[in-house]
Amino acid sequence: MLLKLDSRKADFQADFTRLVDERRESEGDVSRDVSAIIADVKKRGDVAIAELTQKFDRHDLNKGGWQLTQEEIKKACDSLPSELMDALKLAATRIRYCHENQLPESSEMTDAAGVRMGVRWQAVEAAGLYVPGGRAAYCSSVLMNAVPAKVAGVKRLVMVTPTPDGFVNPAVIAAAVISEVDEIWKIGGAQAVAALALGTEKIKPVDVVVGPGNAWVAEAKRQLYGQVGIDMVAGPSEIVVVADKDNDPEWLAADLLSQAEHDPTSQSILISDSEDLIEKTIEAVGRRLEKLETQKVARESWDKHGATILVQSLDEAPALVDRLAPEHLELAVADPDALFANVHHSGSVFLGRYTPEAIGDYVGGPNHVLPTGRRARFSSGLSVIDFMKRTTYLNCSQEALSKIGPAAVTLAKAEGLPAHAESVISRLNK
């Protein structure tokens, strides 16, 4: 049943705390299964990959091919409607522009002691992108993960995607081409993540693995982190909409359902100072659910995890939002920037009535790969930084060392590390 809260009620804080603490991520214990798959790939390599692909995807890699061929890629792109191809290209252009403006600059300075120091940013050499497979076209996820990697300067970008019965969605292939993906492998699941992280006879390992997936994919990324970098371990999608009385309930209902239709464990929350707007929005959600193709999933999400919060003033909203730290936040109010100034924890924020979250999913520009499960309190969405690393460097002249070296000797001796001290002393005494 939809949760309806009212900040004027005596039990509001307790009820809101339960909402914040609600656990929606899968509690199924897939850890043991994933550990076994990783161990199998580590031991048997391509043989394990082929067997698991046959088992889960009913695709014989040795007969149907491990990688997409140029002929298969061309055929897929040619089959796409021009309208869809144009939309993919527009989205890629906008994502590229946004992420080019995120590139960090290397820097160097010389301090008063004459020590030259700096930081140099470089892209990782290889990155792996996981794309969910089947007939669902997650083409936007390809763009959102692959374009930043190439903007960062990644030379080898590898995509893996499950191919149930040998099928790969043409829109996914086209998005990979537009994003300049270098290799497309017909494998999926935890075994694909293991192949990217560990490498096999056919597949060279990568340095970073990104991309969405099911519980097994997320668990594989978690277990392999440290051997390979990852973007994040994401959970169910979520949205908080803060709205004043001057909104169209139909618009708000559509926005709330845009996240509810993702997964039964997704969460959609409406915060408003207008009880009338809340009630009309709830009614609009009900009407829209009757016509929605994804109504089964969306209804379960809305009924089990949806919530409305009536506040006395929208000034209360930022504090509530910060406790929820949502993946997506819409500020559908007259002055969204004023409210935004007081919000500190959200994966991405959509300002004003004409900026639905769905625009950010596809063509807005900023990345749609965002922290969930309140992780926006300490982490950020995917960016070029996830495909880069920084190296610091120092350069001391003899004169510079003579100025700062004695302090290093003192600290080394205080820590009981004589070899450290001698490393500096030997140069000071020369």
From Swiss-Prot:
NAD(+) binds at residues 130, 191, 214. The keyword Oxidoreductase applies. GO terms for cellular component: cytosol. This is Histidinol dehydrogenase. Catalyzes the sequential NAD-dependent oxidations of L-histidinol to L-histidinaldehyde and then to L-histidine. It holds the Pfam family Histidinol_dh. InterPro entries: Ald_DH/histidinol_DH, Histidinol_DH_CS, Histidinol_DH_monofunct, Hstdl_DH. One of its GO terms (biological process) is L-histidine biosynthetic process. It catalyses: L-histidinol + 2 NAD(+) + H2O = L-histidine + 2 NADH + 3 H(+). It comes from Zymomonas mobilis subsp. mobilis (strain ATCC 31821 / ZM4 / CP4). Gene3D superfamilies: 1.20.5.1300, Nitrogenase molybdenum iron protein domain (3.40.50.1980). Transmembrane segments: none annotated. Belongs to the histidinol dehydrogenase family. Binds 1 zinc ion per subunit. The active site is at 327 (proton acceptor), 328 (proton acceptor).
